């Protein structure tokens, strides 16, 4: 703090004391001030805080009576002085006198250059200095503190006040909290901020303010007053008139009138000429005005000299402070001519007006999409760049938008501040609450302009419109595959990372997406919250309900552009299109086999894991697929829903019906690429091809014997279990295989359906016919490893081997071999 030696005579002391508006000076004892005895008594009233006058309303003490009187008038609103002409009231005599001079036209002086009228001598003297063209030696007070700015002042007091931010000096201290200030007005304004004491109250709404100027600004909200009228153009402004006049002021170069100041004229000329003589030594940026340079330099110094007296927030520019103060006053001076909505900032009004004009001036250089706001364009750019500058401190996840980060952080805090009035359900986001409330109202305000379909959410409409446009704005950085939905991209990216974030607590199954986990949990809980209004059937997922409702309406909105076939579900269309493209995007990690559907891959993988999660409630038998369980259930119920239109025969499985139809038609569309043999079913081809490859993927877990077919393995396993589940109704004999039972029943019926084409002989079993046909063909497929003799039947080979070679070996071992 600066040490100043001050010598006062009585008059100077009186003026010194008047600078302290509350009658109290802070931290002045260290100045070393000296005065005569009489003056010292008066001086001590100030510096020893001899406060004889106390305000009963506010509890504040004063050293003199006049500040107390003024304080009480402020609180009570009492005005002692009334104007004779306009009946305006004043609480101070000085203000009353000045007002009367204004009314009477009694001017202390009128300046020749600008005809401004001044009613007080002090004002007139100060005003003259504005017009006088002072030379360097006539500007008596020059700032040279630390060589900062060399700004000159007409008043020494202004110089001292100006130098304090350079020196860091804060001479005035508020004794309640020891906070120091550069200006004497700041500790006067500060107590109201410190104790929450706001003297100036609005009569309309009751809002209170620390400063009368802020109250005056606030009152304009109620009065709609725009006090500054410019005679030149007739427009009125809530902001100062001078600022507007600067924009209207013109000079000879641009066809207008002259400037009031030479410096203003020169500054304006630089703008027209593009001249920028003032350069920042930090970054080299140039400016046309020194004031602009000084304001810019605060970016480098971090200086924020303008402080809000309401909340103590600081700003680098005075204009920023002025705009900020509207937060406290509630002033919204910028009004929309179209809808009457008012705004705190002019920039906010301009942005709002684009709603009415439809203007979108900001265009994306990558995809040519346009936006109404520059901030929206910057946010959109991050889709193309992949930039996510906002990172969560809890989990490290990054986001493209700060609003999304803030919303995400509620996951960690578990905060759900938005509650539904109808059902009491709470939400993390306000948008989620609004969307939820449409469930209660049934409102769907968003309509597709192409197909007139309506949606409850705007986001759902935007996603839907991509069906018509074919737009896929989300691209994978790894494989460059594009997606219509961001969620689909995120799910896809987990294929590359292998990451599965969400785990089911019941069964441990993991999912890429939280929504998938929520849906999966309903398997365990049995919850089916979505009900069909037509038939009452319930579903675990909303998409299932939507698809089901199309059964009632007959709607099939998804059409194949290759063959014209239509589908109820889009997923069914996508799967169908793979028939035309031959695409099989799902590959088994164990054996490399590929599938066109994910469900087929999942079912296939259970072959390797042995998992059978679907259990029959009747017999306890387990299955790898839910469809297999449903088909099995029909054994217990006897249901055969699939009927042949030609012969009326019914089947429990649709695959059995298709196979039956091919038997009648003789169709065999599936051909083996190795030998050209054709089959009526695709599964038969797959099974047959194992003859060529020698593959036997099904292994018995008891004896380890491998099999080419799963059905063969199941039959084999009955040897170990002794199971014979197929019983003859005629004689009660049981069999391990259904085919054996069918063959046996022909003994009772005498049926011989298999006939030889060569000789017409008929047989009860197909295997017997095949053996018989070898008589005509001469085929003997079974060869003895010992002697090379061949046989028609496998049984004949076994008999030969036992009788001839096994007997010979036995005799040789006993010493009866050939000599």
Swiss-Prot record:
One of its GO terms (cellular component) is nucleus. InterPro entries: C2H2-ZF_domain, Znf_C2H2_sf, Znf_C2H2_type. A zinc finger (C2H2-type) spans 141-166, 200-222, 278-300, 306-328, 334-356, 362-384, 390-412, 418-440, 446-468, 474-496, 502-524, 530-552, 558-580, 586-608, 614-636, 642-664, 670-692, 698-720, 726-748, 754-776, 782-805. Gene3D superfamilies: Classic Zinc Finger. PROSITE patterns: ZINC_FINGER_C2H2_1 (PS00028), ZINC_FINGER_C2H2_2 (PS50157). The keyword Signal does not apply. Keywords: DNA-binding, Metal-binding, Nucleus, Repeat, Transcription, Transcription regulation, Zinc, Zinc-finger. Coiled coil: none annotated. GO terms for biological process: regulation of transcription by RNA polymerase II. The keyword Ribonucleoprotein does not apply. One of its GO terms (molecular function) is DNA binding. It is found in: Nucleus. It comes from the Eukaryota. Belongs to the krueppel C2H2-type zinc-finger protein family. May be involved in transcriptional regulation. This is Zinc finger protein 658B.
């Amino acid at each position: 703090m600066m040490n100043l030696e001050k010598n006062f005579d009585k008059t100077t002391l009186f003026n010194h004391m008047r600078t302290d508006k509350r009658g109290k000076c802070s931290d002045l004892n260290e100045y070393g001030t000296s005065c005569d005895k009489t003056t010292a008594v008066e001086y001590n009233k100030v510096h020893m805080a001899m406060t004889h006058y106390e305000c009963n309303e506010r509890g504040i003490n004063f050293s003199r009576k006049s500040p107390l009187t003024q304080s009480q008038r402020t609180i009570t609103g009492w005005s002692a002085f009334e104007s004779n002409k306009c009946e305006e009231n004043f609480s101070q005599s000085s203000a009353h006198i000045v007002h009367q001079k204004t009314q009477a036209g009694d001017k202390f002086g009128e300046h020749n250059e600008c005809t401004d009228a001044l009613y007080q001598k002090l004002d007139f003297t100060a005003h003259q200095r504005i017009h006088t063209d002072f030379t360097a030696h006539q500007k008596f007070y020059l700032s040279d503190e630390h060589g900062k700015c060399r700004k000159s002042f007409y008043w020494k007091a202004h110089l001292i006040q100006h130098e304090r931010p350079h020196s860091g000096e804060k001479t005035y201290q508020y004794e309640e909290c020891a906070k120091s200030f550069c200006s004497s007005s700041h500790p006067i304004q500060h107590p109201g901020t410190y104790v929450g004491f706001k003297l100036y109250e609005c009569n309309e709404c009751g809002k209170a303010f620390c400063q009368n100027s802020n109250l005056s600004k606030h009152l304009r909200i109620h009065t709609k007053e725009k006090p500054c009228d410019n005679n030149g153009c007739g427009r009125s402004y809530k902001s100062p008139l001078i600022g507007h006049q600067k924009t209207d002021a013109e000079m000879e170069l641009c066809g207008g009138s002259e400037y009031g100041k030479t410096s203003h004229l020169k500054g304006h000329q630089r703008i027209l000429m593009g001249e920028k003589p003032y350069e920042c030594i930090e970054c080299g940026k140039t400016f046309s005005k020194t004031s602009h340079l000084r304001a810019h330099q605060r970016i480098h110094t971090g200086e924020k000299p303008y402080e809000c007296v309401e909340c103590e927030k600081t700003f680098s520019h005075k204009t920023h402070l002025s705009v900020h103060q509207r937060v406290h006053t509630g002033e919204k001076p910028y009004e929309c001519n179209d809808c009457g909505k008012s705004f705190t900032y002019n920039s906010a009004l301009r942005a709002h007006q684009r709603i009415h004009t439809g203007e979108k001036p900001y265009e994306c250089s990558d995809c040519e999409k346009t936006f109404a706001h520059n901030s929206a364009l910057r946010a959109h750019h991050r889709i193309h760049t992949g930039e996510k500058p906002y990172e969560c401190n809890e989990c490290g996840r990054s986001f493209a938008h700060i609003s999304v980060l803030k919303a995400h952080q509620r996951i960690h805090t578990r905060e759900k501040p938005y509650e539904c009035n109808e059902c009491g359900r709470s939400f993390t986001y306000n948008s989620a609450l609004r969307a939820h409330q449409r469930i209660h109202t049934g409102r769907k305000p968003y309509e597709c302009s192409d197909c007139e379909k309506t949606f409850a959410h705007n986001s759902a409409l935007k996603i839907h419109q991509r069906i018509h446009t074919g737009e896929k704005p989300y691209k994978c950085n790894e494989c460059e595959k594009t997606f219509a939905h961001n969620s689909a991209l995120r799910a896809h990216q987990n294929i590359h990372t292998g990451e599965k974030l969400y785990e089911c607590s019941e069964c441990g199954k993991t999912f890429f997406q939280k929504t998938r986990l929520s849906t999966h949990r309903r398997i365990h809980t049995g919850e089916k919250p979505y009900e069909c209004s037509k038939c009452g059937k319930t579903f675990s997922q909303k998409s299932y309900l939507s698809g089901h409702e199309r059964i009632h309406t007959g709607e099939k909105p998804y059409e194949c552009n290759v063959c014209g076939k239509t589908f109820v579900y889009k997923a069914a269309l996508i799967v169908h299109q793979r028939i035309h493209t031959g695409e099989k995007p799902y590959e088994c990690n164990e054996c490399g086999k590929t599938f066109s559907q994910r469900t087929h891959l999942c079912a296939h993988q259970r072959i390797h894991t042995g998992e059978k999660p679907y259990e029959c409630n009747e017999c306890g038998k387990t299955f790898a697929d839910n469809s297999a369980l449903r088909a099995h259930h029909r054994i217990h119920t006897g249901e055969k829903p699939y009927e042949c239109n030609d012969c009326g025969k019914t089947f429990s499985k649709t695959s059995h019906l298709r196979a039956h139809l091919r038997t009648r038609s003789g169709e065999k569309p599936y051909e083996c690429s190795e030998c050209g043999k054709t089959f009526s079913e695709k599964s038969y081809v797959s099974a047959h091809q194992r003859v060529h490859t020698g593959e036997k993927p099904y292994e018995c877990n008891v004896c380890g014997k491998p099999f080419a077919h799963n059905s063969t393995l199941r039959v084999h396993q009955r040897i170990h279990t002794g199971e014979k589940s197929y019983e003859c109704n005629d004689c009660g004999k049981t069999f391990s295989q259904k085919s054996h039972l069918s063959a046996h029943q022909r003994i009772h019926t005498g049926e011989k359906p298999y006939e030889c084409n060569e000789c017409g002989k008929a047989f009860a079993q197909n295997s017997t016919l095949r053996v018989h046909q070898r008589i005509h063909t001469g085929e003997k497929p079974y060869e003895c490893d010992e002697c090379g003799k061949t046989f028609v039947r496998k049984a004949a080979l076994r008999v030969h081997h036992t009788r001839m070679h096994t007997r010979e070996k036995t005799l040789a071992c006993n010493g009866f071999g050939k000599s």
